[in-house]
Amino acid sequence: MDEAARVGEAGFDFAEINLLHPHQAFQEIPSLLRIKEQHKFFYLVHGPEEGSPFDCARLRASLLPQIKTLVAFASELEARIITAHFWLDERYIQPPVLREKLAILEEMLMLAREKQTAFCLENLSERACDFEPAFRHFPDLGMTLDIGHGELLSPENTAYRFIETFPDRIRHIHIHDNRGGNSPGDDLHLPLGEGSINFPPILSALVQSGYDGTITLEVPPHLFVQQREKLLTMLSSAQNRG
């Protein structure tokens, strides 16, 4: 809640609320609505951690109820987008598990449809080909493209192929820096420019694809304003190159 107020005071158009424990968040709704009205912005909502990505029984028993609560919370705030982690990397998850996960994902989407809220999956280590079955099965499934995650476990940032292959599915962007790597510990969430990600060509590809949606800076809160100016400069350059 404090971070939402800080985002509003800095003049941002929206705040993305990260809900690690959705069931505990409802008591904050009145305060969050006051902040929204005060600063005339809107909300996006980010869901809880998936837990074990291989245990479908646990996902049904634990994650699905959390997603149901998350959707209800987002609806109360009139949040425009819900983002969830739901790992679909075919290199590590066996086909029978992936098939069951698609069935679980369909149930998540049904919950979001009931509240008329856009539902997006965020890429972790996945490549574009890993999202293809989900996009093929579910025409209304969106994507939150995490450019920082795209730098991990890949010789080339996976954002390029996502933008090339599924530009119409990208509804939101997460941006932060890192130095590449092959483990969760390499997901450093550094300020832009403090890692090794080459942002200008990625942003140029994004601009050329026609994307004009929201971008969340996933960097330390005290750097929000400074990083916003840096990002706006890079986006302006990308538009000029386009």
Residue spans of the language-model regions?
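Acidic-and-aromatic substrate-binding clefts and catalytic sites of carbohydrate-active enzymes
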Residues: 1-2, 17-31, 51-61, 90-93, ...
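N-terminal pre-domain/capping segments
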Residues: 1-69, 75, 142, 240-242
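Histidine-acidic metal/acid-base catalytic patches
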Residues: 2-8, 78, 128-134, 138-145, ...
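Alpha-helix-loop-beta-strand connector modules within alpha/beta enzyme cores
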Residues: 33-51, 102-114, 199-204
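Charged helix-capping and loop-helix junction motifs
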Residues: 28-33, 59-68, 97-106, 155-164, ...
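Helix C-cap/helix->beta junction micro-motif
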Residues: 37-39, 77, 115, 209-211
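Hydrophobic faces of well-ordered beta-strands that scaffold small-molecule active sites
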Residues: 15-17, 43-47, 82-84, 119-121, ...
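Active-site acidic/histidine proton-transfer and metal-coordination neighborhood
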Residues: 56-142
